[in-house]
């Protein structure tokens, strides 16, 4: 009898829960429309559901009428966006994840101390753009080990490194090792920049890979952490698909042998995961569903003060 092993934790992290609540509570408090700069989180199901309730998603603040409210997404923004919002008399509400804010704060602090900052991340990702925007003259982004070899800094340059919060633990280990080898005096945060949810989801998946022959990651193609989960499996030789809907499941899975693991990115709603479980169960008669608990998460982030109940 084949098994479907469900990784835990999976799906929504506390930062995503908070960001969605920010939009929902704002809509309840002030009514539609509420403008949101960028997708609040990188998941089409979430974005479409909020759009149906009256949220309007924009990439540029010029598309927000003067004087309206605008919410910043969980990924964070550069200071230039806040300045533009102020100039246009927008009422801004910040849904940036607290762990992303921690990385912003570290960048500003160490730049003020005279350090050159190396940011491990994907240059075009909105989170990285926001961090770089804090102190652009101090930050250099590296995406791979080869970028470390091309860095122009001398051995006596004060260096500090941080990372995008949603990266592969494997990639960060490789790149940070290369940084330490080239610059032994480089320093970083006492605790990792990688967020707890990214770490837990990757480690939970790693822990079951020896027991399965296939992996499904439920998440959006635009979700960094969902893509990294798929890479965790592929890097260890286990075939893996990134799916956003039950319809994305290849019906040929019935012809595969062995057990299957399923996890979900940090912005994936649990109802989508459950729909995917039902689809697999319909394709594979007698499929046994087993929960594998790697960690229990209890992190909760408060809503912005303007949205808290008085």
From Swiss-Prot:
One of its GO terms (biological process) is terpenoid biosynthetic process. Isopentenyl diphosphate binds at residues 42, 75, 125, 223-225, 267. It comes from the Bacteria. Gene3D superfamilies: 3.40.50.11270, 4-hydroxy-3-methylbut-2-enyl diphosphate reductase, catalytic domain. InterPro entries: LytB/IspH. Dimethylallyl diphosphate binds at residues 42, 75, 125, 223-225, 267. (2E)-4-hydroxy-3-methylbut-2-enyl diphosphate binds at residues 42, 75, 125, 165, 223-225, 267. PANTHER family: 4-HYDROXY-3-METHYLBUT-2-ENYL DIPHOSPHATE REDUCTASE. This is 4-hydroxy-3-methylbut-2-enyl diphosphate reductase. It comes from Chlamydia pneumoniae. The lineage of its organism: Bacteria, Pseudomonadati, Chlamydiota, Chlamydiia, Chlamydiales.
């Amino acid at each position: 009898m084949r098994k479907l092993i469900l990784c835990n934790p999976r799906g929504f992290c506390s930062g995503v829960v908070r960001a969605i609540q920010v939009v929902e509570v704002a809509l309840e408090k002030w009514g539609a429309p509420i403008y949101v700069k960028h997708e609040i989180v990188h998941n089409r199901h979430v974005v479409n559901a909020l759009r149906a309730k009256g949220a309007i998603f924009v990439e540029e603040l010029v598309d927000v009428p003067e004087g309206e409210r605008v919410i910043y997404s969980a990924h964070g923004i550069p200071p230039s966006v806040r300045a533009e919002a102020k100039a246009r008399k927008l009422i801004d509400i910040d849904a940036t994840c607290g762990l992303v804010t921690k990385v912003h704060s570290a960048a500003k602090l160490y730049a003020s101390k005279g350090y050159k900052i190396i940011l491990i991340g994907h240059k075009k990702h909105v989170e990285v753009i926001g961090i770089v925007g804090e102190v652009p003259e101090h930050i250099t982004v590296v995406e791979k080990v080869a970028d470390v070899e091309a860095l122009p800094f001398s051995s006596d340059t004060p260096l500090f490194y941080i990372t995008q919060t949603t990266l592969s633990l494997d990639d960060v280990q490789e790149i940070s090792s290369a940084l330490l080898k080239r610059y032994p005096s480089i320093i970083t945060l006492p605790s990792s920049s990688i967020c707890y949810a990214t770490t837990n989801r990757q480690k939970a998946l790693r822990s079951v890979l020896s027991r399965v022959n296939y992996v499904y990651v439920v998440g959006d193609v635009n979700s960094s952490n969902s893509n990294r989960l798929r890479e965790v499996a592929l890097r260890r030789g286990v075939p893996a698909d990134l799916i956003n809907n039950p319809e994305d499941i290849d019906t040929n899975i019935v012809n595969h042998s062995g057990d299957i693991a399923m996890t979900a990115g940090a912005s994936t709603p649990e109802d989508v995961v459950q729909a995917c479980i039902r689809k697999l169960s319909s394709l594979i008669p007698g499929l046994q569903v087993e929960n594998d608990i790697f960690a229990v998460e209890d992190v909760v982030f408060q809503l912005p003060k303007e949205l808290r109940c008085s």
